[in-house]
Swiss-Prot record:
It comes from the Eukaryota. Belongs to the glutaminyl-peptide cyclotransferase family. One of its GO terms (biological process) is peptidyl-pyroglutamic acid biosynthetic process, using glutaminyl-peptide cyclotransferase. The gene is QPCT. GO terms for molecular function: glutaminyl-peptide cyclotransferase activity; zinc ion binding. It comes from Boiga irregularis. It is found in: Secreted. This is Glutaminyl-peptide cyclotransferase. Residues 1-23 form the signal peptide. The lineage of its organism: Eukaryota, Metazoa, Chordata, Craniata, Vertebrata. Its EC number is 2.3.2.5. It holds the Pfam family Peptidase_M28.
Amino acid sequence: MAGERRDSKAAAFFCLAWALCLALPGFPQHVGGREDRADWTQEKYSHRPTILNATSILQVTSQTNVNRMWQNDLHPILIERYPGSPGSYAVRQHIKHRLQGLQAGWLVEEDTFQSHTPYGYRTFSNIISTLNPLAKRHLVVACHYDSKYFLPQLDGKVFVGATDSAVPCAMMLELARSLDRQLSFLKQSSLPPKADLSLKLIFFDGEEAFVRWSPSDSLYGSRSLAQKMASTPHPPGARNTNQIQGIDLFVLLDLIGARNPVFPVYFLNTARWFGRLEAIEQSLHDLGLLNNYSSERQYFRSNLRRYPVEDDHIPFLRRGVPILHLIPSPFPRVWHTMEDNEENLDKPTIDNISKILQVFVLEYLNLG
């Protein structure tokens, strides 16, 4: 995550975010004293999760394996991978290979484009993995897979961005792998509402600034993809709706992997979904499923509010997409340093948050 902590801009950005939150239709609209019948693009605002019981939670968490994730997915991503680098290509191929090998039958696409940077034109490639492209509505879980570009160091070290965002990438791949059976069932369902709701995983390229964070030097992948989705009819052949309107909720993971993270609420219009994360965390703790965990160091805290942070959700937020931003506050101490590496990751924390996220996704998709 490359967004600098620019306090001078925080208040102005908060006003923008607040205005957008208020503009989002959280309740059915009334005209002339009667309630208009909401179309499918409005269903996200009344969507309800299927709360998993203890038996289901135990089954879900038994399917995930942090050690396997560490070896099979995290290690291949913990390399220098700034846009256009050999490492970027290698990580992109790894992500696609892992998703294409699952039984659920993901549609895995590369969104490749060129954009001007402080170093001239560069090629970027987002990865979009869609469980059921024919579904009208999609829960989106996203992160960025690029690492920040640093000039060659005298000691030969390279920036691998372990929390930023190798770990979120690995967590998303582990989510797809461990929930493969349930997601296969969801894709095969032909009856509403399951047939109309699916999952999309997005791995953004070019989140980081090459030189200094600015509107033109940052968020290359998300800016391009949001614009593309806004101009792409959805469902296919539609005349009045597009892929942006097909996003139910945009869950963005960033800077995850350090010990004792604290996630505050950034957007009030999605606070009810943040509350589900908090409740799931408590349920897992009550069931003894969180490792090296103390309730005094709770991860998700709905009583904490923070100004929004600039990240890959911004181009989608500006187009009215509901955002759930999972980025800790404060940032990890190793942020944007060569110390953001495997040595400074905390495996129990990653395992715990991964379990919480997997339960959340199943609940949202009504796969309880």
